[in-house]
Amino acid sequence: MNDFSQRFLFDDTDVRGEMVALRESYAHVLAKHAYPQPVAQLLGEMMAAAALLVGTLKFDGLLVLQARAEGPLSLLMVECSSARELRGIARYDAEQIGADADLQSLMPNGVLAITIDPSRGQRYQGIVDLDGVDLAECLSNYFASSEQLPTRFWLKADGQRARGLLLQQLPPHHQSEPQERQESWNHVLTLADTLTAEELLGLDNPTLLHRLYHQENVRLFDEQPLQFRCSCSRERSASALASLGQADAELLLAEQGGSVVIDCQFCNERYAFDAADIAQLFAGAGSEAPSQTRH
């Protein structure tokens, strides 16, 4: 399995972890756009982060990470569903991006929004400044500054692989004394901080855990598959056209030379609607779906 998340627990301390490995879904996202290497790396890190966060949540819905700035990289966005389906996109000015560009040069004065959109229930959004040296530090800062469980991230991507590690301190169970809990938490963090980029990207999960925590009692759970999937569809595109109203849809059809084309920014899928399709959209509630003709 090339794309998966995997949970682990420390038996003697109140800490849990999550690891993510992405290859095929990451390649699928990069294949849709000719991203510069620094952008591709950041996008991979954000994909890994989104998958890590979904692994810590019990919900049915969508998690969205969206970073915005007024720099060379104006938008970085990843969605991960509770079904562990990922997609991502970036908007950038290639002429302003150097080969060694980092987060701060790409997205100066940026902000990161973390949105949890459940199928049922209230939508939640948290916002943090992109003021860390990398995305992992920004996310860790968000959890440190909010009323969340203490959480740390380690993220790496190289244009072919994206990997992530998350550690989270749980409410008291094995340990109740605050100083003991803090010492245990600091201990697992200190060991994780010794990870190199090569190790995080290259080691399989059992080997990585043994490398870090061979003196601890750690339980590693089964792998949970992750995959790329875009939620766009012809039906959604048709609904977007229908929402314009018949007069505006027909005007758009005329302006575009007899065929309205809607492109998905995430996957580059193209949905085309001709005059017959537009007429069918407004033919009444009992009409059939638009034809499957594409141009």
Curated annotation (Swiss-Prot):
Judging by the UniProt lineage, the source's domain of life is Bacteria
Q: Which UniProt keywords apply?
A: Chaperone, Cytoplasm, Disulfide bond, Redox-active center, Zinc
Cellular-component GO terms for this entry:
cytoplasm
Its GO biological process annotations read:
protein refolding
Under the heading SUPFAM superfamilies, the entry gives: Hsp33 domain, HSP33 redox switch-like
**A molecular-function term among this protein's GO annotations:** unfolded protein binding
Q: Does the keyword Cytoplasm apply?
A: yes
| InterPro entries associated with the record | Heat_shock_Hsp33, Heat_shock_Hsp33_C, Heat_shock_Hsp33_N, Hsp33_helix_hairpin_bin_dom_sf
- The answer to keyword Chaperone applying to this record is yes
What Pfam family is a match, any one? HSP33
List the signal peptide residues.
none
Compartments it resides in: Cytoplasm
Spell out the family assignment given in the record's similarity comment: Belongs to the HSP33 family.
HAMAP family annotated for this entry? HslO (MF_00117)
The protein, known as: 33 kDa chaperonin
Query: Which gene underlies this protein?
Result: hslO
